[in-house]
Every structure is written in structure tokens, then in C-alpha cells.
Amino acid sequence: LSVCFLILFHGCLASRQEWQQQDECQIDRLDALEPDNRVEYEAGTVEAWDPNHEQFRCAGVALVRHTIQPNGLLLPQYSNAPQLIYVVQGEGMTGISYPGCPETYQAPQQGRQQGQSGRFQDRHQKIRRFRRGDIIAIPAGVAHWCYNEGNSPVVTVTLLDVSNSQNQLDRTPRKFHLAGNPKDVFQQQQQHQSRGRNLFSGFDTELLAEAFQVDERLIKQLKSEDNRGGIVKVKDDELRVIRPSRSQSERGSESEEESEDEKRRWGQRDNGIEETICTMRLKENINDPARADIYTPEVGRLTTLNSLNLPILKWLQLSVEKGVLYKNALVLPHWNLNSHSIIYGCKGKGQVQVVDNFGNRVFDGEVREGQMLVVPQNFAVVKRAREERFEWISFKTNDRAMTSPLAGRTSVLGGMPEEVLANAFQISREDARKIKFNNQQTTLTSGESSHHMRDDA
């Protein structure tokens, strides 16, 4: 099964599917969007942005936000599209079940009579802890669950890449539930929203009893005829699973990251199916300032997560950027060469301007905490913090997303001859030199010497 799974993954690597219909990205106005639908469950809520909005249709993605209360369990589910999950706040644990991979977490055997008695000790696949700032990657069709073991709510934002080649259905985001009776959070527009059911509900009870070799009474429990929904409270105020202690888990995570760093440093690669699938890294934290790729004191930082430092992203054809700007700081104008950028405000608010291929300003406003903004591929964008710190995360639809700056030391204009700029803009060569060399920052700059962005279109 592991071999088949590997072949399936490699068959999905070619490229994102060309789902876009003609004129689907002919957008003359962008908006910072709040979720359109909200569903409340026993131990949490699920919110979704309308996947049929023109911004999300252009980018080929769907977005959902989960809030899980303490001791809440997000029931097992999978999707028709690969997912990137960003943990906005909270901590907990998650299980991601790959077909064909061994159950490496096992309870200790109680005596040698266990096999003779016919009773089995529990065993399951690896459980991963998560915390604020973690990115969790989940391929299409892979089941996962999530549990809040902290004292405050867990909030996550999930991108579903419905245009990805791993999705061979249509562009409708689908959640397939293995338990519970959750509603379809993406179908708010339907006035008569049908009650959700899990996959087992659709099968014949007798057939399932034969498949599991249990009685029909137990199968009826699998069909979950209750009203708790998709996020439920765990009995006894604790989810009892097999896992290392917190200190052991943290040490293991650190040693795993050090091992990966060492392999990258010496150019080594993992080899073997078990290492590629069953023990691959699915999680990385991008909230630590020490991991910043671009950092300017008192201005801000940018941290990039792509297929170079989390290899599974090559399979998913996705990447992520985390940004932090301090008061009045600026991300220099740029465009994304090979991806759409889906911006989610994590903290504070920032001023953003986006310009299309006609030179029209299609967005000029604020992106606040909890809002989403799509910046289509090649549209130029600039971000600026206002009177407070602004934090955001950008999901990008390419595993090695690239940007091209319009200003600064590495800008596209800086790579052109002065004479070209002088003739293009009808300016002197001295002014052309100012355009090329006045700002020697590469990506981030302080707002002290810059003028406010004006409405001088």
C-alpha cells in the first residue's frame, strides 16, 4: 500500500490543474472578506468564506476557520483537496492517518497471555503536538483529527487548494466525515441546508457488520445518530491516547528539526518509502523570530516555508509566508511571479494596495485581524502597518513561490540601465540613479523617511 501511495503522490506532482475558466480572474475590485457562514457545534465553531466568491474562484482555493474549545475534539475527516492549516492560537494534538503506514504508537503488553486471551492493546499511528504558529500539511484524501488539550480555545485557518492536481473532482470543496453529523459549512447559500451525515450513514448496516465483524448494534453507533456535530466534548475531561510525555515530545521535535537541518547542510536526502511517506515531516513552526528569512530591527520580519524546508509542500504545490510589521513599517511594492497569494490577518491591521495589469488600484484599504484578501498572480501589492503592529500569513499556490520587488536594492528597476529608465519615465539620468539606488533595503523599510500612501490615482 505504501508503494501505491507513493506512486499516487508522484502522479500528482506535475502541476496545478488548469481549472480556471475564461475570464475567471477578470477582477476589477478586491475586498477584505469576513467569513460568510458559521456553524456551531457542541465544543466549537466552524466558519467558512464563500468558495464561489470571484476572488476565491480566481485563486482556486477555499478557506475555513475552526475554533475548538478546551477539551474539544474535531472529529476525523478528510477532503478532496490538499490542505494547509495555520494555528492562529492555542495548543493541542492531531492525528494524521496515512493508508498503509504502521501503527507505531503501541500500548505496553500486559503479560504474555494477551495473545491467548484474544484481547488487543491499543495501537495507532503517530500523534503530533501543535502550538501557535505551526503549519500542518495534509494531502488530499488523508484523514485527520484534532484535539484541544490547552486551557484556551484553539483557532486554526485552513486553506483547501481545490485547483490542485490532487483533486480530480470539481472545484467544490468537500469534507468527508468519518464520524458525527456535521453540516456542510460551505453551503450557506442553500436555503434548505440538509443535515450532514458521516460516511458510514450511507452504507447498509448488515454489510458494515460483516465488514467490521461486529454486531449491528455497534454499527448503528458508527452511524452517529446524535446532534453533537463535528466538534465534540471529550469524556472525563481528557483524551487518553498513547504518546510521549510533553518533555520527551518536545525533545524529539527539536532533534528531528536538527537532523533535517544537518541533512540539508550536507546535501543528504532521505531514502526509502517508509521515510518518504510514513515518517515524513508534516509540521513546521514559522512564528519563531529566530527563523526569520528577512529581518530588520524595529521594522519587521518575513519567514518563508516552502518545499526546500518542508519537502511535503512539493507534493502539495503550496507554500506559506508569515509577516510581521511594526508601526509605520512597509513591505516594498512587489508582485508574485508564479502564484496567487491569499492573505489572512492574524493580528492588528495593515494598509494594503493592489494594482492590476491595467494600472488600476483594485484594492486600497485595511486588512484586519480575521479578514482574508486574495492577491492574484502578477498583481502588484504593497503592505504597510499603521499605528500598531500588523501580523499576517500568506498562503501561496506554488511550492517555491517567487516575488519580484518594484523598489529597493534588488528591484526590477534596479536591474535596468539608467538610460532605459531615463527614457522610459522622461527623467534625467540623475533622477534615474535616485530611483535605482536611493533605497538600499531589499524587502522591508521603515516608515520614518517615507511618505504616506496617497489617493492620487
From Swiss-Prot:
Region annotation CD4(+) T cell-reactive epitope: where it falls in the sequence: 233-252, 289-308, 297-316, 321-340, 329-348, 377-396
Ranges for region Binds goat polyclonal antibodies (pAbs), but buried in the 3D-structure model: 395-416
PTM field: Proteolytically processed from a single precursor to produce an acidic and a basic chain that are linked by a disulfide bond. Not glycosylated.
Mouse monoclonal antibody (mAb) 4H9-binding as annotated region, ranges: 41-55
Residues covered by the Cupin type-1 domain: 30-220, 284-433
SUPFAM superfamilies: RmlC-like cupins
UniProt-reported outcome of changing residue 36 to A: Loss of binding to mouse monoclonal antibody (mAb) 2B5
A GO MF label: IgE binding
Outcome when changing residue 34 to A: Significantly reduced binding to mouse monoclonal antibody (mAb) 2B5
Annotated region described as IgE-binding, given as residue ranges: 15-29, 105-119
A Pfam family that the UniProt record links to this protein: Cupin_1
Chain residue ranges for the region called Mouse monoclonal antibody (mAb) 2B5-binding: 34-57
Region forming the signal peptide: 1-14
Region described as Linear epitope: spans on this chain: 265-289
Basic and acidic residues composition-biased segments: 261-270
Site (Critical for epitope recognition by the mouse monoclonal antibody (mAb) 2B5): 34
Region (Conformational epitope): 29-37, 31-48
CDD domains xrefs: cupin_11S_legumin_C, cupin_11S_legumin_N
Disulfide bonds: 25-58, 101-278
UniProt KW keywords: Allergen, Disulfide bond, IgE-binding protein, IgG-binding protein, Seed storage protein, Signal, Storage protein
UniProt-annotated stretches for the region Binds goat polyclonal antibodies (pAbs): 32-45, 55-86, 215-239
Phenotypic consequence of residue 52 to A: No effect in binding to mouse monoclonal antibody (mAb) 2B5
Name of the protein: 11S globulin seed storage protein Ana o 2.0101
Organism, as annotated: Anacardium occidentale
